[in-house]
């Protein structure tokens, strides 16, 4: 379980937003542009959620390591993870393809094909901001999965 290792320790990994979110935020900024506004709706040990106003998109995001928050239709097919983004009403599910991702990335870094500070700054700044913001609850443009945890 993630809470037993350093990954679930806020002081060691930065928590959910830093540990697993940084990659997602990096992808979002690469596709949709820089973060213009950053709001946090939910912060618990096993889930974080918020919303971004990016240069070219508005995004509601939800991250969790809790299997109970995965949609029932995803659990029904035996899937243990769920990664999805909906753009203009069309869902793109991208849960697969992450096997050995870190190992492959580290090999590329050792070959000199890593990323510099300029490429990493936006994502690191985003997670730092999230870590320092207070959660506002079910206000504004929150992700619908927040209702699995919070009550109006």
Model-based region annotation:
Residues 101-107:
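Conserved C-terminal active-site "lid" loop/helix of NAD(P)H-dependent oxidoreductases
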Residues 107-152:
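C-terminal helix-rich "cap/oligomerization" subdomain common to oxidoreductases
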Residues 1-36:
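Predominantly a Rossmann-like dinucleotide-binding segment in NAD(P)-dependent oxidoreductases
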Residues 35-44:
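Conserved S-adenosyl-L-methionine
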């Amino acid at each position: 379980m993630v809470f037993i290792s350093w990954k679930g320790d806020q002081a060691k990994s930065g928590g959910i937003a830093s540990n697993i979110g940084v990659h997602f935020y990096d992808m979002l900024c690469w596709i949709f542009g820089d973060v213009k506004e950053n709001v946090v709706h939910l912060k618990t040990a096993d889930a974080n959620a918020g919303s971004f106003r990016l240069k070219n998109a508005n995004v509601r995001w939800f991250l969790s390591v809790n299997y109970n928050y995965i949609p029932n239709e995803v659990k029904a097919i035996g899937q243990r993870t769920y990664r999805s983004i909906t753009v203009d009403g069309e869902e793109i599910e991208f849960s697969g393809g992450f096997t050995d991702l870190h190992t492959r990335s580290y090999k590329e870094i050792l070959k000199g094909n890593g990323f510099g500070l300029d490429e990493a700054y936006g994502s690191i700044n985003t997670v730092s901001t999230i870590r320092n913001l207070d959660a506002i609850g079910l206000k504004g443009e929150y992700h619908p999965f927040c209702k699995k945890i919070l009550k109006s």
